[in-house]
C-alpha cells in the first residue's frame, strides 16, 4: 500500500530543500504523533526506530525502485524506452564505470531538465553501489 506521503513523490526530485520543507514538517508531525514525542524531543532516533526516511531519501528511494523495475523488465515500455544502458555507448566512449550495469545520463542544460526521469533515474541509479544495482530482489536493495 502506498502511503499518501509517498504518492507520486518521484516527481518532486530536484526540488529545493525549502520547497520540500512543508512536506518534511508533515512527516515530522506524524513521527511526533506515532512515537508520542514532544516538540523539543529529537526526531531522528524515533525515525530510525520506525524505519522511516526523510522526504529527500524517500524520493530517491522511489526513483531507485522504478529504476530497479526497469532494469528487471517489470516496468512499462514508456519507462524503459527512455533509458539507454551504458553498454550501448561507442567503444571509445566507454569507461570502466560504465561496465557495471549503469545507464547513460544524457546531457542537459537546464535545472528543470535535470528533474526529468530520463535524467534523474540514471543519475540516482549510477550513484548506487554495484552490489545493490545487480541484485534481483527488491527487499535486498532496500
Which sequence ranges carry the predicted segments?
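Hydrophobic/basic alpha-helical segments
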Residues: 1-142
Amino acid at each position: 500500500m502506498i502511503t499518501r506521503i509517498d504518492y507520486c513523490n518521484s516527481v518532486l526530485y530536484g526540488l529545493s530543500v525549502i520547497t520540500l520543507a512543508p512536506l518534511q514538517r508533515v512527516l515530522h508531525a506524524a513521527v511526533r504523533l506515532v512515537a508520542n514525542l514532544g516538540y523539543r524531543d529529537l526526531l531522528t532516533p524515533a525515525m530510525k526506530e520506525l524505519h522511516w526516511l526523510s522526504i529527500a531519501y524517500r524520493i530517491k528511494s522511489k526513483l531507485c525502485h522504478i529504476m530497479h523495475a526497469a532494469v528487471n523488465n517489470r516496468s512499462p515500455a514508456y519507462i524503459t524506452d527512455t533509458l539507454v544502458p551504458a553498454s550501448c555507448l561507442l567503444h571509445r566512449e566507454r569507461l570502466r564505470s560504465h561496465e557495471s550495469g549503469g545507464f547513460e545520463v544524457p546531457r542537459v542544460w537546464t535545472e528543470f531538465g535535470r528533474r526529468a526521469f530520463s535524467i534523474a533515474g540514471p543519475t540516482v541509479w549510477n550513484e548506487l553501489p554495484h552490489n545493490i544495482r545487480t541484485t534481483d530482489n527488491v527487499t535486498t536493495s532496500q
